[in-house]
């Protein structure tokens, strides 16, 4: 079975202290777009970076990238990997970056696979980023970004539920309960418990399979709006493999994450002392182990708890190209139904970049025509 390139709930949408602050343009009316776009400082997006020239294990918690505590106004979000990279200076420490900076950071700091990085970064940028200014936020919006575009623009960054971020995260709660982005001690203790029960005190792929199923069942039982279809169906499985693949010291590389290191990444956004990145590029390696532990069909609760209903129209692991097509033709197109001139050009450019990360064998779609 083939599996689509996966990335955890990475990235962003919006503004930065060093630049004029801009929110996502998604959801604005044509009249609002016509008024706002001429006021923005347009940036020509850089080309997606290629793979690392040297992708071996190396010290990444080094003198050039020390951990620093948050300053007032710094942004962090639901993704422990991105939070950690920002706190070590691989990303701008304020939590706002361009797609190029993010792809470089996840490769250099964690040895994340290039194709997966391109796929996830541009997917998030398309739905949560500002395509004119080429800026993305890894978490919440902030007053330091300046005036937002008028409603109904999406201004939530990675914290925005239902565009990129989704339900049943390992250490963050569902958006239904009010906080989908902060570290959740209760959920982390569940991760520790499952690591003790199924991994001999270490988090590994066996633990990932059991914990993924547990979090799905918890959401079915408590969240009447639980949704587990299409994009989230893919990323939910992929993200459970990342701690075993990326948070284990690369000199050991045994897929066994100890709990001190897990807490350091998940809670404190901090690499362990003397930490080496993985010895080769990787992303969702072993995801088939997680999927096969407790196979699920995509679906959702229908307005009440314990009402999980299979959605036969959702893409799944046998139809990765359908996931890509629905993301572009439905999700992106619904956010930008009739873009013109500069915005249309930016959309087409970023859709082209996004397609570079899509699984081989899929056919590119052009919802806005070809430039």
Curated annotation (Swiss-Prot):
Entry GO MF terms: heme binding; metal ion binding; peroxidase activity
SUPFAM superfamilies: Cloroperoxidase (SSF47571)
Matching InterPro entries: Chloroperoxidase (IPR000028), Chloroperoxidase-like_sf (IPR036851)
Uppermost EC category: oxidoreductase
pH dependence remark: Optimum pH is 4.7 with ABTS as substrate. Optimum pH is 7.2 with benzyl alcohol as substrate, and there is another optimum at pH 6.2. Optimum pH is 7.2 with dimethoxyphenol as substrate. Optimum pH is 6.0 with naphthalene as substrate. Optimum pH is 7.0 with pyridine as substrate. Optimum pH is 7.0 with veratryl alcohol as substrate, and there is another optimum at pH 5.5.
Cofactor note: Binds 1 heme b (iron(II)-protoporphyrin IX) group.
GO BP of this protein: hydrogen peroxide catabolic process
Sites carrying sugar chains: 54, 184, 204, 225, 329
E.C. no: 1.11.2.1
Chain residues in the propeptide: 19-43
Family of this protein: Belongs to the chloroperoxidase family.
Annotated protein name in UniProt: Aromatic peroxygenase
Source organism phylogeny: Eukaryota, Fungi, Dikarya, Basidiomycota, Agaricomycotina
Gene: APO1
